[in-house]
């Protein structure tokens, strides 16, 4: 029984969803980050503004879970994955003929752009682990889209 058959052939609907999604990601990445680093927007934050070592941040959060409140821990681990699941669904909806490998490259470039702008503007922390977690989220989104397409929930 197909209760959720969605006809998303209208590119307009997908474009609006993507624009809303990008706005949300930019808000979380730049405006929302000030709640994690008080004073950042005033230019007085003096903490580390980058991590170029793969798995350093992930390891810190996973092996020192007791040192962080749940919100901080969740945002910096699972939140980074969850944030990018929608783009893994939306790109194939907008560009159905695009190969999955190219979709992953677009997701990687989107994440790298956000992290680079955070580094340059100092409105966040450039973290290679965020790029890895974001890419994992995008990949999960691609897999979800593929599953839903096979089940014919998307036309």
Identify the meaning behind each predicted range.
Residues 125-145:
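Alpha-helical transmembrane segments that form the membrane-embedded catalytic/substrate-binding core
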Residues 1-123, 142, 146-155:
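Bulky hydrophobic segments
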């Amino acid at each position: 029984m197909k209760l959720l058959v969605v006809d998303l052939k209208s590119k307009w609907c997908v474009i609006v969803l993507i624009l809303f999604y990008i706005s949300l990601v930019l808000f979380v990445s730049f405006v929302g980050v000030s709640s994690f680093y008080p004073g950042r927007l005033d230019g007085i934050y003096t903490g580390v503004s980058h991590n170029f070592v793969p798995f350093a941040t992930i390891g810190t959060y996973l092996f020192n879970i007791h040192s962080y409140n749940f919100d901080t821990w969740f945002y910096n681990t699972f939140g980074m994955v969850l944030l990018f699941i929608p783009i893994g669904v939306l790109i194939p909806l907008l560009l159905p003929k695009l190969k999955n490998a190219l979709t992953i490259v677009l997701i990687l470039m989107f994440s790298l752009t956000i992290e680079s702008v955070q580094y340059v503007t100092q409105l966040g922390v450039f973290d290679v682990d965020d790029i890895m977690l974001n890419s994992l989220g995008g990949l999960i989104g691609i897999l979800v889209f593929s599953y839903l397409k096979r089940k014919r929930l998307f036309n």
